[in-house]
Every structure is written in C-alpha cells, then in structure tokens.
Amino acid sequence: MTNITTKTDDGICIVKINRPEKLNAMNIDVAKEIISTFKQLEKDDNVKVIILTGEGEKAFSAGADIEYMSKISPEESERYAKLGQELTATVENITKPTIAAVNGFALGGGCELAMSCDIRLASDNAKIGQPEVTIGIPPGWGGTQRLMRIVGIAKAKELVFTEIGRASCRESR
C-alpha cells in the first residue's frame, strides 16, 4: 500500500493518505487502500483508536482526483461513486473510535471522509467544504446526510445552499 501509511503506538493508529503532491486526492486505488486498512485495523486488538489524516500541511484530502476522474468512463465513474460510499460507510461503521485530524483542505470527498469519522479536529489552516455544489453536483458519498447529523438541518442547508465552500472551521460551526 503506497497511498496509505500507518503507524501504531500505544494503541493509537495514525492512518495517513500519502499523496501530498496531489493534495491527498483520492482515486480508486486510494479508496480501496483506505477500506482495506480500516478493515484490517478493525481486527487488530492492539489498535484502540484510529486517527485519519493527510500527509503534509496543505491537505487532509482535496477529494476526488480530478485528473483521474477526467480520464475514466461513465461506468468507471459510477463504480468509483459506489466505492466512495463503501469507503465512508466503512469508516463510519468501524467499532473503534475514529478521529479526522484535518490539516489544510478537506474538500468534496475529503470533507465527506472527515465527516465519516466520529470526531473531527481541525488545524487553524483547515478549509472544509463541498465545492461541487456550486456547479450543481450533490455530494455523492452520503455527505449531505452526515452533515445534517453533525450540524443540524438548518445549518446543513445554509452550508449546502450558500456553499460557504472552503469554509474555515470557525465558519462551519
């Protein structure tokens, strides 16, 4: 697994998306590796807590790898969307506590991935949002439902309809 790194110490496993040159954007391989990693960690009795983050200071994850997305067929795009739903469901449903350590951008699928964790902690430079709504594309990995559960219906509508976009952490509270 080259796109994901893990380090476990004293029951805490840090899982890093390791594509800093792409702002930790996710393609099908990254999504599969995260799913596989979380399934392995679920079975590991030495792991008590999982922290998910992105390599580097610029991004937790910029979401879908747009370069990758521009080159795939509609059928592959549909498979990728379903895999994204599996990814967020896997993270959300793991029995161990999960923490998203959001550094830099958490956009689109990256935002949805962070919302799948039990707790989200953000650095001062974090920018969180779902900019796809500005071009009429709804979040495809269950993000709208998770957002409502996290911030409430009224705030979720405000965030999605007005698209605070790459909101600072203070703005998205």
Predicted features and spans:
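A short, glycine- and basic residue-enriched loop/turn
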Residues: 20-23, 57-58, 63, 105, ...
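Glycine- (often His-adjacent) and acidic-residue-rich active-site loop
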Residues: 54-89, 106, 136
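Conserved CoA-thioester-binding segment of acyl-CoA-metabolizing enzymes
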Residues: 1-53, 75, 89
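Crotonase-fold acyl-CoA enzyme core
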Residues: 90-170
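Short, conserved glycine- and acidic-residue-centered signature motifs
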Residues: 27-30, 80, 107, 140
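Phosphate-coordinating loops and pocket residues in cytosolic domains that bind phosphorylated ligands
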Residues: 25-28, 62, 71, 161, ...
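Hydrophobic alpha-helical membrane-association signature
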Residues: 30-34, 80-83, 113
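Hydrophobic/aromatic residues within transmembrane alpha-helices
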Residues: 15, 52, 65, 113-114, ...
